Amino acid sequence: MHYHTNLIAALLLAALIHEGSAIWCYRCTSATPGCAEKFNWRGIGFLGEHCPEPDDICVKVTERRGARETITRDCLSALSFRKDIPADKYEGCRPAAHDEKLANYVNHTIKEHDVRRDYYTDTTFCFCFLDHRCNGASGLQTSAVIGLLTLIPALLLR
């Protein structure tokens, strides 16, 4: 009898525990104080935000042209509009992908719109999802707590 009670409690707990909640990432640009190359989380004034997707990745995009440098820190899902994201998104840094057909059929004369994404001469994407200093899942969702609370009476009735 105890075996069945423990089995039911374990199955209930497994059903109620969801994936870890969304990853936390810093979301800022180098125009924000503290978000440049020398990062200072106290300067940006917050500890990051939840990414909207459950399997998201934190990204740091560094774009350079001459002495000018722009750094963007965000979730990968928020940058999904970009066409130069490298195919390999595993932990680490790599150069931006180059799309030969990007804006090939566009008759566009306003260079500030940068439809060809060629304003910056050097673009690097750094992906981060394993390093706890970069981000961290906030643990189990509240349904896991509810599952544990329902498991405790089952174990106490033994």
Curated annotation (Swiss-Prot):
Glycans are attached at residue 107. Residues 158 are cytoplasmic. A lipid is attached at residue 135 (GPI-anchor amidated asparagine). It is found in: Membrane. Residues 136-158 form a propeptide. Keywords: Biological rhythms, Glycoprotein, GPI-anchor, Lipoprotein, Membrane, Signal, Transmembrane, Transmembrane helix. One of its GO terms (biological process) is liquid clearance, open tracheal system. It is a lipid-anchor; GPI-anchor. Disruption phenotype: Conditional RNAi mediated knock-down in tracheal cells leads to aberrant tracheal dorsal trunk development resulting in tracheal tube size defects. Conditional RNAi knock-down in tracheal cells compromises epithelial paracellular barrier function in trachea due to reduced and irregular septate junction formation. Residues 23-136 are extracellular. This is UPAR/Ly6 domain-containing protein crim. It comes from Drosophila melanogaster. One of its GO terms (cellular component) is septate junction. Residues 1-22 form the signal peptide. Belongs to the quiver family. The keyword Protease does not apply. The chain crosses the membrane at residues 137-157. InterPro entries: QVR-like (IPR031424), Sleep_regulator (IPR050975).
